[in-house]
Every structure is written in C-alpha cells, then in structure tokens.
Amino acid sequence: MRQLLLLLCILLPHLLPARTIYVVSVGIAKYQYINNLRQTENDATDMAALYRTHTTHVTLLTGKNATRQSICTTLKNVFAQAEADDVVVFFFSGHGSKGGLCAYDTRGASTCISYGEIAKIIKGCRANNKLLFIDACYAGGLRHDSNAAVSAQSSFDKTEGVMLFLSSRTNETSRENPYGRNGQFTRYLLRGLKGGATITATALWRRRNSSTLWLSTWPRLPRASSTL
C-alpha cells in the first residue's frame, strides 16, 4: 500500500494536495578538481523543472554551487521541513566513487559525500516517503556502503519508506548519452515519470531499462531498489 502511495506521489502529486513534496536536485558538469561531464546539470535542471509544476519546495544546486558543504547542508535543511505525511526527493547527477558521490570540490575519495552520510540524512528525515534518484558511477553503493565503519548507517531497513532508483551497481560505472540533452538514465527516468498514472514502479523501471538496452550495448543493468 505504501508503495502505491509513493508512486502516486511521484506521478500524480497534483492529486495529493495535502502532501508537500520537498525536492533537492543536484547536477555537476564542471568540477573544480576532477574531469568534467556534459549533461549532468541538464539532468538536475530538468528534474527540478518537472517537480516545480507540482511543488514550490524545489532546490536546485548545479556547478560550483554544489559543493560538499552546500549539498549536505541543503539536504539537512530542506528535508528537516518535511512532516511524516510529506515526500522528500533527492536527485543527483554527476561523478560517483565507490565511497560516495562527488561534489564540485571533491578532490578524492576522502572528500566525497559518503553513502553513509547521505543515508544518515535521509534516515533522520521525518517523511515516511523518500525517493532517491542517483545517476552516477557506483551508485549501488548507496544500498550497501563498502566502508565497514559506516555500513550500519548506510543500509536502509524496510520500515523507512525509501525507494532508490540507481543508474549502476556497486562495482559499475555509468556513461553519458552521446546524443541529446540528458544522460541515458535520466532521459528515460524523466520519460517514465511523465508517462501517466497507469505506470507502476516495476513497469517504470522496465520501460526505462528496456529502452536503455535497446539503444545501447552497455554491459550493465541499472538498478531499481525499493525498501517499502
């Protein structure tokens, strides 16, 4: 039942006026210290635009504004406003490492935003419905952080109402789409989210996944995971 409610919040937020949606959308194309990307800021901008048609609580961080401190502080402050019946959404498109997500000012693995930190922020939020869309290399690490010191913090138990949409497994890299405005993962994610009320979580993932496989020869299968 909670899964159905959560999908309605994703696809039909205008039908649930009593529920407030809080969104933090992050995209980084030009990094301070590591190699640049092309479409990631477009990804975050388009995801923010999609949710702005349904809520005023959308924060967009791109480029040099998406520092480590800024991302963590924004997630904490924005999601702290949510009540139990609300929905929080975190979208990230950029570089990822096996230890976490790379902010604008990330220099190496020790300065990334660890999966444990992200999970701690999400788990501390009062909202019962939490969505994470991660378009980055090694995104699967968010499910099970490889760092033993924070693995307990980064795992999501089944009571937390968290749904993860991840572009890669723990040991996989992601690739940008050589054509168009958006990366491959985000392109089909956006298309799926705009697809109408009849789509389910499984159908949404199958639609995006089958399209990706049809358009490319990438030796990987992006992952969807629900702890609902």
Residue ranges with predicted function:
Residues R2, L7, L16-L228:
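Cysteine endopeptidase catalytic domains of the caspase/legumain-like
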Residues I10:
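Active-site glycine/GP-rich loop and adjacent strand/helix microenvironment
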